Amino acid sequence: MNIKSLLLGSAAALVAASGAQAADAIVAPEPEAVEYVRVCDAYGAGYFYIPGTETCLRVHGYVRYDVKGGDDVYSGTDRNGWDKGARFALMFNTNSETELGTLGTYTQLRFNYTSNNSRHDGQYGDFSDDRDVADGGVSTGTDLQFAYITLGGFKVGIDESEFHTFTGYLGDVINDDVVAAGSYRTGKIAYTFTGGNGFSAVIALEQGGEDVDNDYTIDGYMPHVVGGLKYAGGWGSIAGVVAYDSVIEEWATKVRGDVNITDRFSVWLQGAYSSAATPNQNYGQWGGDWAVWGGAKFIAPEKATFNLQAAHDDWGKTAVTANVAYQLVPGFTITPEVSYTKFGGEWKDTVAEDNAWGGIVRFQRSF
């Protein structure tokens, strides 16, 4: 009996000790739920919330390859072979809502590669570092093409001039600015007012742009100034801009009208005038006092879009371009284009040939 009592007592003690240890044990917390990427559909397709924030981000871009032949319709020179170019563009948009309106950013990085015909007959070209790619050779480069901040109607940063953007650029062709319509990329501070009845207005202070041969940036504290008015409706739109070049103290203006004939066919016409009859300026870069551009677009029922543009300026340059943008599959478009330029009047003395025919085929994958 004593042994039996001892065994029962030992078992009871072990059970009691085990219960006490269980009561004192540390309970591990449940793992936190993983925060997966959430889709943000407030600003269109492709946006998602940055984890831990209410900011929506979109990452997109394109890869492009161009093959050019025939004449250079900008300069009138014969390429004597194929010119090729590739570009990878990477774009980032962010948007979030604040008490002052939508706060957004946009940036675009461009990685470019150009391989032009050597222009040497029967021998390889000179690809030295000091040789201009326009004379033949290989060129690579990386550009921060856009980087700006928006808050409501306010915009500040690197963008393209309101002299282009507010009126809607030119036509949907690759060689659209053979008759030039002004500089593009610029640092700027701009404000756009958008009314609820289709009316909008813009005012911008701009630093000015540059191209291969010229620098049109300001030379002091006084910026270039651009102002514009626009009205848009279901039928189309009409817009006008006036720009003041603070370096040469001259002004230029453009007026553009777009009309939607049907939901697939549209036409547009733009006229421009400059108080300084010279292309060597930031805005009125056409030849002479005035220039005119016009074009049409037809969206075919299937996968093709047809574009046509013609332009003429006061000095006698005439440029005509047509293309077909064919979407082979969603996101991949092939665009063959043909262009013609007639260098007449005062332009004849600036080019080797009066007539230039050129062609280009563009392959572009957008994502």
UniProtKB/Swiss-Prot annotation:
Its biological purpose: Forms passive diffusion pores that allow small molecular weight hydrophilic materials across the outer membrane.
GO MF annotations in UniProt: porin activity
InterPro entries: Porin_alphabac (IPR003684)
Record-given protein name: Porin Omp2a
Compartment(s): Cell outer membrane
Membrane topology: Multi-pass membrane protein
Kinase is among the record's keywords: no
Miscellaneous information on this protein: The pore formed by Omp2a is larger than the one formed by Omp2b. Omp2b pores have optimal permeability to allow growth and protection against harmful compounds. The larger pore formed by Omp2a may be advantageous for intracellular growth, when the bacterium is competing with the host cell for nutrients whose concentration is particularly low within the phagosome.
Keyword Translocase: no
Gene Ontology BP annotations: monoatomic ion transport
Domain-level remarks: Consists of 16-stranded beta-barrel sheets, with large surface-exposed loops, that form a transmembrane pore at the center of each barrel. The pore is partially ocluded by a peptide loop that folds into the pore lumen.
Signal peptide positions on this chain: 1-22
Family stated for the protein in its record: Belongs to the alphaproteobacteria porin family.
Keywords of this entry: Cell outer membrane, Ion transport, Membrane, Porin, Signal, Transmembrane, Transmembrane beta strand, Transport
Subunit and interaction comment: Monomer.
Gene: omp2a
Listed GO CC annotations: cell outer membrane; pore complex
